[in-house]
Amino acid sequence: MIRDALPGDWPAIWPIFAEIVRTGDTYAYPADTDKSTAEVLWMTKPDRTFVFEHDGKILGTYYLKTNHEGPGKHVCNCGYMVSSDARGMGIARQMCEHSQVIAVAMGFSAMQFNFIASSNDVALALWKKMGFDVVGTLPRAFNHPTLGLVDAFVMYKWLSD
């Protein structure tokens, strides 16, 4: 079940966030992001944050926020994280599908992913399957912990027609 995240969910979200950010191979957050900073980034700054819960356990989370104010406010941005023990179960796909429905309900017309590491093959394949296009390449913009500097992609999908 996907539902809005509650403040009391943070203790279950934090280990997912911390593990993903510490590996340093997908998100551009500092690997040493502390718990309170992470909570603001994931739970406070976004317009909404959601959790994927199964049998009372939080297995994934995503945020949805306005990508830019003013003339670009019709475009939203999302970030998704899935617990390492729950990967390969289709949770990211379900959260992405859910986020698109919520985005349209919130008045957004498009969704943009700002910084997808070119080395993140699993995410790239999924987002492409879900109709997102690579609309920009940032050469050597992501410093991968083992591969060094790799490109980052901007991905985009129009949601309304």
Language model segments and positions:
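Acetyl-CoA-dependent GNAT
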Residues: P7, T26, P30-D85, C96-H98, ...
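Conserved catalytic-core motifs of GNAT/GCN5-like acyltransferases
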Residues: Q112-I116, K128-G148
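Short glycine/proline-centered loop/turn elements that form peptide/ligand docking sites
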Residues: C96, N120-A123, R140-P145
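Conserved GNAT acetyl-CoA-binding A-motif
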Residues: A103-I116, A125
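A short beta-loop-alpha structural element at the N-terminal edge
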Residues: M1-I13
